[in-house]
Amino acid sequence: MAQVQYRGTGRRKNSSARVRLVPGSGKIVMNNKAIEDYIPFASIREVVLQPFNVTETLGNYDALVTVRGGGFSGQAGATRHGIARALLEVDPDFRGPLKRAGLLTRDARMKERKKPGLKKARKASQFSKR
């Protein structure tokens, strides 16, 4: 018999994550690597676990994640968004706690573009009055 799995897609900055949740022991695999090997910072790994903590399902599901684009922070945010959406498929009653924690909202903040005549998006060369 086919194993039950729940899917979710998450995005953050320039990252996009496809998440599959399967009932298991709580292992998280990102791009075929354990999360401890893929993300070297504990504080950023905590971001990925937030949906499980909010819904008190930590250790009940294994997450298989394919994530592309961006850096550690963006990828962790995209994964968090995808896990939250997949948990909604598991149980629609999770919508309340996930929504209150702000985990179902796509974070629309993006990198500001560089403007012509400036060094970066807002950094200008030093102004000399005389």
From Swiss-Prot:
GO cellular component: a single term: cytosolic small ribosomal subunit
Keywords for this protein: Ribonucleoprotein, Ribosomal protein
Record SUPFAM superfamilies: Ribosomal protein S5 domain 2-like
GO biological-process terms attached to the record: translation
Pfam entry (one): Ribosomal_S9
Gene Ontology terms for molecular function: RNA binding; structural constituent of ribosome
Record's compositionally biased regions (Basic residues): 111-130
Keyword field contains Phosphoprotein: no
Disordered: annotated segments: 101-130
The keyword Disulfide bond belongs to this UniProt entry's keyword annotation: no
UniProt record similarity statement: Belongs to the universal ribosomal protein uS9 family.
HAMAP family: Ribosomal_uS9_B
Designated name of the protein: Small ribosomal subunit protein uS9
Organism of derivation: Levilactobacillus brevis (strain ATCC 367 / BCRC 12310 / CIP 105137 / JCM 1170 / LMG 11437 / NCIMB 947 / NCTC 947) (Lactobacillus brevis)
